[in-house]
A protein has these predicted regions:
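Transmembrane alpha-helices and adjacent helix-loop boundaries
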Residues: 1-231
Length: 231
């Protein structure tokens, strides 16, 4: 029978929390850069006059959404250095593992968030665009002032879900040696020769639950504020 000592959960928490900034940094960079790439993919599918760009965007989204995160992480970690050495004669052996994790997460997040952006844009009544143009706004002004706020409100719950999924995918970073929250937990288990594994993973779970709770509360607050502003 496996013994469980709750006090060790709180004993290990401070050590694991030291790795929290790295986890949050990976998530932040991925959301920022992945959203930019995702917006480009959504735009290519919605507004591109080139069939080639449309096909590329659709193929990208399909392939990346069908690729298991851990498979892509290993492909980037082992394949990107080989590719950069062959193409640019660039030695990346000294690069931080964080780079490979962020690149992987950006590729994955962009595929999922592009579908969120596309669906939200299509959900906005097309009469809004015509109304904006009819009062003298340019296409860009109409998009920024009228379409974007409405699309963001529609997309917000799915954006939150995408970020939560990203948080779970990013936990795989420990498999290539990155000492994030999950990696710190595994180091503790190794130092204790496999003992207190359940207590350690409980501490790790508490941190992820905390991140998810804060993110959900922020999302609900933003939804409430947007609904109140449109009331």
């Amino acid at each position: 029978m496996v013994s469980y000592t709750p006090t060790y959960v709180f004993k290990f928490l401070p050590t694991i929390l030291n790795a929290l900034p790295l986890t949050l940094w990976v998530i932040f960079l991925t959301v920022l850069l992945g959203s930019l790439l995702g917006a480009g993919l959504a735009w290519a599918q919605l507004n591109s006059a080139s069939d080639g760009w449309v096909a590329f965007a659709k193929a990208y989204v399909f392939i990346l959404r069908c690729t298991p995160p851990i498979v892509l992480l290993f492909m980037v970690f082992y394949g990107l250095p080989e590719f950069l050495t062959w193409w640019l004669h660039l030695d990346v052996d000294d690069w931080s593992r964080t780079v490979f994790v962020v690149v992987t997460m950006i590729l994955l997040f962009a595929a999922s968030i592009s579908e969120v952006f596309k669906a939200a844009y299509l959900a906005v009544p097309k009469g809004q665009l015509e109304a904006g143009l009819s009062i003298g706004l340019t296409g860009f002004q109409t998009f920024v002032r009228i379409l974007l706020p409405q699309a963001f409100k529609i997309a917000l719950p799915n954006i939150t879900t995408a970020i939560l999924n990203l948080m779970k995918d990013a936990a795989l970073a420990y498999t290539i040696g990155l000492v994030d929250v999950m990696g710190a937990g595994n180091l503790i288990i190794s130092r204790n020769l496999g003992n207190y594994s359940l207590e350690t993973y409980t501490a790790v779970a508490l941190i992820y639950w905390g991140i998810a709770l804060i993110l959900s509360l922020v999302s609900h607050f933003m939804e409430y504020s947007l609904s109140k502003g449109n009331a």
